[in-house]
A protein has these predicted regions:
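Charged, amphipathic alpha-helical interaction segments
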Residues: 15-16, 84
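Bacterial N-terminal signal peptides
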Residues: 6-15
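Short loop/turn segments that connect beta-strands within beta-propeller blades
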Residues: 100-102
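Repeat-blade elements of multi-bladed beta-propeller folds
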Residues: 24-28, 70-94, 120-147
């Protein structure tokens, strides 16, 4: 299967200039999981102008092609945005940092938990990562593994 994270943005570049300054640091955006951001770049007047800015291919795709037993069940992860970086987990338990502007992979950490074999539940699934920061100079991306 081919999984892609698709990021859309308005063709009005000036309107999206401040979007890079807004983080989405947790699932649901805040401790209350409101899933809301007070942004005004996309509205009823320009939503029809949205276009694909970039696509990101999950590294799980290559693993699934090399060994069909490693094919994920689905892609259910929600990325976090910290600064100009998206952090995401893949169904096979990899963690990626992605440049939010151009979709290029900055780094990838492979836990190799898929080496333990397919889980007996619904197969390979992963829902995301968590972020912690001391508010100064230390930051941690946390991900529970599939095994």
């Amino acid at each position: 299967m081919n999984y892609r994270l698709v990021i859309l943005f308005s063709s009005l570049l000036a309107a999206t200039a401040n979007a890079g300054n807004t983080d989405w640091p947790t699932y649901g955006n805040d401790a209350g999981s409101s899933k809301y951001a007070a942004l005004e770049q996309i509205n009823s007047g320009n939503v029809a102008d949205l276009r694909v800015a970039w696509q990101w291919q999950s590294p799980d795709t290559a693993l699934g092609k090399a060994d069909p037993k490693q094919t994920p069940w689905g892609f259910k992860s929600t990325p976090l945005k910290i600064g100009n970086v998206l952090y995401i987990s893949t169904s096979l338990g990899q963690v990626a940092a992605i440049n939010a502007t151009n979709g290029q992979t900055i780094w990838l950490f492979d836990t190799r938990t898929y080496d333990d074999g397919r889980p007996t539940n619904l197969g390979y699934n992963h829902r995301g990562v968590a972020h912690w920061s001391n508010g100064k100079d230390k930051s941690i991306i946390f991900m529970p593994t599939n095994n």
